[in-house]
């Protein structure tokens, strides 16, 4: 995800070379003499399908907000300084494509395109078709390796040297590409199916989880709550008593019921509701259409990319704020004195101590990185286009007054 190329066109050239080398090299040197004519024709038809899916992943636009887009009540009013337009929920400005992208997942250097609302199905189909094709090639090359092993006692002149050299070269190359694609596909599908998130939203959730115990995060959330609901944030209570038991310091001298605490003591990061997770089936259908359309080139998302269906848990969400709840920015805090005492109780609770000492606690959204070292910049987000100082919530009172 963090790959950035000096010449972006190389990002398309490299996959084309690898696909052509594996697909046609395997056919010319190995399959031509080991598969029937029908099998070879079907194989080449499938290779054409892979090329078509890759072409669509490159050329299909991910989608951009309409001109003069107006956010609804309860949504973030986020202005793009470069597009001179408001951004819908889940949208970001891509620094490479130089435009706002609907439901931006990431900018993919290997397709020279953003993966977003409209072309995510094409991207997933390309990766899926590539995995199936690579699996078949690996299977056939593996059969040849077994054949060479069984023929190891035969005279060497009975073995096709060109074919053997091709197998020795193509097998590790194909395996390397296969493993790389599998990792990417599994990561995308886990986030899409089981969490309903884009790669950027997963990063945002990790950021909020990392800074969940900090006052600067909760000062901003309290400010946002008052802006949207017109009242102070109530006392928050966790739905997961087991998680709360382990996350809250048992030896804390603070009263958990004290609402004057800036950071809620009875609330955990698991209690933050991600509004767009509708369940495995609905997540896949909304992103890629019904199952019988998943492998077809015209299968696409069922939503418009401007407004998204929220899950039923939003009715029980104690914060009642749009995603992300801090709006992507937080209240500034005074510099923390590095020379502080650590109590015995803190030494006994190492996870809490590590969170407290994590240097990412006081990082801004543009600086923060996850455990893999990824920042928003690595996903292609143009932070210079964001007008954080003027981002605001659209309250119901504003809509009614207008």
Curated annotation (Swiss-Prot):
Catalytic activity: L-cysteinyl-[protein] + hexadecanoyl-CoA = S-hexadecanoyl-L-cysteinyl-[protein] + CoA
Top EC category: transferase
Source superkingdom: Eukaryota
Keyword check for Hydrolase: no
Side of membrane Cytoplasmic, spans: 1-8, 61-125, 187-402
Pfam families: DHHC (PF01529)
Record keywords: Acyltransferase, Endoplasmic reticulum, Lipoprotein, Membrane, Palmitate, Transferase, Transmembrane, Transmembrane helix
UniProt comment concerning the protein's domains: The DHHC domain is required for palmitoyltransferase activity.
HAMAP family membership: DHHC_PAT_PFA4
Family note: Belongs to the DHHC palmitoyltransferase family. PFA4 subfamily.
Protein name in the entry: Palmitoyltransferase PFA4
UniProt organism field: Debaryomyces hansenii (strain ATCC 36239 / CBS 767 / BCRC 21394 / JCM 1990 / NBRC 0083 / IGC 2968)
Biological classification of the source: Eukaryota, Fungi, Dikarya, Ascomycota, Saccharomycotina
């Amino acid at each position: 995800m963090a790959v950035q190329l000096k010449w972006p066109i190389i990002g398309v050239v490299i996959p084309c070379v690898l696909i052509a080398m594996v697909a046609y090299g395997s056919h010319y040197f190995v399959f031509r003499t080991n598969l029937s004519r029908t099998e070879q024709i079907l194989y080449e038809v499938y290779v054409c399908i892979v090329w078509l899916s890759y072409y669509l992943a490159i050329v299909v636009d991910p989608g951009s907000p309409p001109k003069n887009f107006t956010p609804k009540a309860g949504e973030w009013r986020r202005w793009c300084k470069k597009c001179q337009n408001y951004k819908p929920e889940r949208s970001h400005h891509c620094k490479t494509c130089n435009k706002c992208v609907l439901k931006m997942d990431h900018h993919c250097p290997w397709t020279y395109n953003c993966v977003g609302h409209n072309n995510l199905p094409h991207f997933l189909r390309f990766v899926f078709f590539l995995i199936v094709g690579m699996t078949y090639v690996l299977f056939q090359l593996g059969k040849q390796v077994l054949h060479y092993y069984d023929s190891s006692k035969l005279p060497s002149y009975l073995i096709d040297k060109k074919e053997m050299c091709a197998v020795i070269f193509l097998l590790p190359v194909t395996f390397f590409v296969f493993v790389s694609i599998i990792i990417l596909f599994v990561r995308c599908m886990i986030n899409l199916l089981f969490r309903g998130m884009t790669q950027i939203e997963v990063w945002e959730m990790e950021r909020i989880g990392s800074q969940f115990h900090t006052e600067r995060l909760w000062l901003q959330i309290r400010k946002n709550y008052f802006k949207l609901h017109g009242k102070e944030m109530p006392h928050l209570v966790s739905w997961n008593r087991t998680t709360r038991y382990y996350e809250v310091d048992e030896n804390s001298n603070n009263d958990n019921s004290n609402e004057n605490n800036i950071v809620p003591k009875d609330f955990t990061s698991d209690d933050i509701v991600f509004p767009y997770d509708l369940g495995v089936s609905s997540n896949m259908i909304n992103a890629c259409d019904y199952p019988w359309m998943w492998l077809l080139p015209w299968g696409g998302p069922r939503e418009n990319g401007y407004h998204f269906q929220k899950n039923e848990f939003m009715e029980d969400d104690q914060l009642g704020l749009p995603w992300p709840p801090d709006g992507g920015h937080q209240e500034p805090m005074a510099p923390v004195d590095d020379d502080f005492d650590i109590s015995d109780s803190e030494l006994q609770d190492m996870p809490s101590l590590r969170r407290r000492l994590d240097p990412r606690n006081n990082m801004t959204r543009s600086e923060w990185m996850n455990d893999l070292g990824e920042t928003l910049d690595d996903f292609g987000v143009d932070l210079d286009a964001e007008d954080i100082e003027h981002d605001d919530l659209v309250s119901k009172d504003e809509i009614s007054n207008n």
